[in-house]
Swiss-Prot record:
GO biological process, one term: lipid A biosynthetic process
Designated name of the protein: Acyl carrier protein
Its job: Carrier of the growing fatty acid chain in fatty acid biosynthesis.
Pathway: Lipid metabolism; fatty acid biosynthesis
Gene: acpP
Presence of the UniProt keyword Lipid biosynthesis in the record: yes
Keyword Signal: no
PROSITE patterns cross-referenced by the UniProt entry: CARRIER, PHOSPHOPANTETHEINE
PANTHER family reported for this sequence: ACYL CARRIER PROTEIN, CARRIER DOMAIN-CONTAINING PROTEIN
Subcellular location: Cytoplasm
Keywords linked to the UniProt accession: Cytoplasm, Fatty acid biosynthesis, Fatty acid metabolism, Lipid biosynthesis, Lipid metabolism, Phosphopantetheine, Phosphoprotein
Endpoints of the signal sequence: none
């Protein structure tokens, strides 16, 4: 598991109150992990803080799974 994947899973676990062990990369924040719209906004803000990046609203709306969050972070994280 990559460092970014591990960090994303940790944030998802903290924000959504689920066990890291229950988070799979294909998990949907809403359908599988029980997030509501406020949870997803807070999740995006936590990802922005963790990875020191900005996620525009139109991009944030497209991040609906753990894998999409990992992919976005990998593509936009400052090295």
């Amino acid at each position: 598991m990559s460092d970014i994947e591990q960090r994303v899973k940790k944030i998802v676990a903290e924000q959504l109150g689920v066990a890291e062990a229950d988070i799979k990369i294909e998990s949907s924040f809403v359908d599988d992990l029980g997030a509501d719209s406020l949870d997803t906004v807070e999740l995006v803000m936590a990802l922005e803080d963790e990875f020191e990046m900005e996620i525009p609203d139109e991009q944030a709306e497209k991040i609906t799974t753990v894998q999409q969050a990992i992919d976005y972070a990998k593509a936009h994280v400052k090295a």
